[in-house]
Structures are given as structure tokens and as C-alpha cells.
Amino acid sequence: MKVIAILFLLAFVLCTMEITMVEAGFGCPLFQFACDSHCRGMGRKGGYCGGNFKLTCICVVK
């Protein structure tokens, strides 16, 4: 029963946290605020630097 509850919780979290990849750059990895500003300018909730060596700007969907 605990396994089912954990799997359900994991599925719920993954469904509520949609992210989309954006082109590399946009301030990453040194200026994460530039990535966040870029994503907000596209109407997203925000953004952060991720991927290998934090070189990719990842935007969080609303």
C-alpha cells in the first residue's frame, strides 16, 4: 500500500511540474537571472539554468 501511495504522489508531482526546454544560452550558467527574465518574457512562470554544466535555460510552464 505504501508503494502505491508513493507512486501516486510521484505521478502527481510530475504532472503538476511541467517544464519545457529552451535554447542553450540566455545567460546560463553565469547569469541565471537573464534566463529567468527570458522565460518570464515568454509568458512562463520563470526559468533556471539546468542540464549539463547548467548551460541550458529551462522555462517552467504556468
Curated annotation (Swiss-Prot):
Q: Which GO terms describe its molecular function?
A: potassium channel regulator activity; toxin activity
One of its Pfam families is: Defensin_2
Which pairs are disulfide-linked? 28-49, 35-57, 39-59
Q: Which UniProt keywords apply?
A: Antibiotic, Antimicrobial, Calcium-activated potassium channel impairing toxin, Defensin, Disulfide bond, Immunity, Innate immunity, Ion channel impairing toxin, Potassium channel impairing toxin, Secreted, Signal, Toxin, Voltage-gated potassium channel impairing toxin
Q: In which broad location class does this protein mainly occur, judging by the first location in its UniProt entry? A: secreted
Tissues showing expression: Highly expressed in non-venom gland (hemolymph) and moderately expressed in venom gland.
InterPro entries linked to this entry: Defensin_invertebrate/fungal, Scorpion_toxin-like_sf
Q: Which GO terms describe its cellular component?
A: extracellular region
Query: Where found in the cell?
Result: Secreted
Question: Which superkingdom?
Answer: Eukaryota
Q: What biological-process terms (Gene Ontology) are attached? A: defense response to bacterium; innate immune response
Signal sequence: where?
A: 1-24
Family according to the record: Belongs to the invertebrate defensin family. Type 2 subfamily.
Q: Its biological function? A: Antibacterial peptide active against Gram-positive bacteria, but not on Gram-negative bacteria. Also has weak blocking activity on Kv1.1/KCNA1, Kv1.2/KCNA2, Kv1.3/KCNA3, KCa3.1/KCNN4/IK, KCa2.3/KCNN3/SK3 and Kv11.1/KCNH2/ERG1 channels (tested at 1 uM). It inhibits potassium channel current by interacting with the pore region.
Q: What is this protein called?
A: Defensin BmKDfsin6
Task: Name the source organism.
Answer: Olivierus martensii
